[in-house]
Every structure is written in structure tokens, then in C-alpha cells.
């Protein structure tokens, strides 16, 4: 009887350990980075199908501050989605996690519209991260 109880408890524990990952535990991948210019500017990061399917995006800013106005995500099926950020990012800061609509999506490219009035003469670097 004890052996049956042990195997039942072990099976229940094993079943609970195979649950899906939470949003914070899903793997993130660096999709690209751009050094920003001074004043109002536009950049894009190309992402290929080889990078995989994504459920979310996040921006990280390094070296210098950046005022990010918006990003436009172009998907593999031709659709595009615009996300207004309107946020001043300090060096070392990051955006909120931007959840992509629908299920996992193929991303072709991401366009950025930003400006910077960097008085410290350090150009900021914007990194684009994708969540699988």
C-alpha cells in the first residue's frame, strides 16, 4: 500500500513540474541594437524568420538617454502594429514588456522613432529583445 501511495505522489509531483513557463521565465533573445543619433531620428532593426517566433518585445537603453516616441513592429504576414511609448529612458533603463497581439509571431523588422538631447555627448544604444 505504501508503494502505491509513493508512486501516486511521485506521479502527481512529476505532472506539476511539466507546467508551462511563466512570462518572466520565458527565454529572451537579443534581436539587435542601434546607436542613436542626436536630434529626431528613425532607425530599424531587421529580424528574420530564423530568429523564431515571439510573444513580446522589450527595449533596453545603454550609455546615454533616449526619448523613445514609438515603435512599429512589422510581422511576417505583412501586418504591422504601432506601439506608442512616449518615454524618456535613462542609460541603463528598460521599457515595459510589450505583449504582441495574437499567438507567437514572426517579426520581419521593428522601426523606432526617437530623439535625444544628450548634453553629456554620449550616444545612447537601444537594444531590442524578443521573448519566445
Each model region followed by its residue ranges:
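Bacterial Sec-dependent N-terminal signal peptides
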Residues: 1-24
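Transition segment at domain starts
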Residues: 20-48
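Charged, low-complexity intrinsically disordered segments
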Residues: 35-39, 90, 117, 129-132
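Short, surface-exposed beta-strand/strand-loop-strand elements in extracellular ectodomains
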Residues: 63-85, 121-131
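Noncatalytic modules at the cell exterior or secretory-pathway interfaces
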Residues: 52-59, 95, 102-119
Amino acid at each position: 500500500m505504501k508503494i502505491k501511495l509513493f508512486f501516486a505522489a511521485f506521479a502527481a509531483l512529476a505532472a506539476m513540474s511539466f507546467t508551462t513557463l511563466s512570462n518572466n521565465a520565458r527565454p529572451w533573445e537579443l534581436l539587435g541594437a542601434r546607436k542613436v543619433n542626436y536630434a529626431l531620428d528613425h532607425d530599424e532593426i531587421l529580424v528574420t524568420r530564423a530568429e523564431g517566433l515571439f510573444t513580446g518585445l522589450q527595449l533596453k537603453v545603454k550609455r546615454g538617454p533616449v526619448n523613445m516616441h514609438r515603435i512599429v513592429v512589422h510581422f511576417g504576414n505583412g501586418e504591422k502594429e504601432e506601439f506608442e511609448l512616449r518615454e524618456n529612458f535613462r542609460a541603463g533603463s528598460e521599457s515595459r514588456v510589450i505583449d504582441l497581439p495574437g499567438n507567437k509571431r514572426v517579426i520581419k523588422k521593428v522601426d523606432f522613432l526617437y530623439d535625444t538631447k544628450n548634453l553629456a555627448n554620449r550616444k545612447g544604444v537601444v537594444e531590442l529583445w524578443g521573448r519566445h
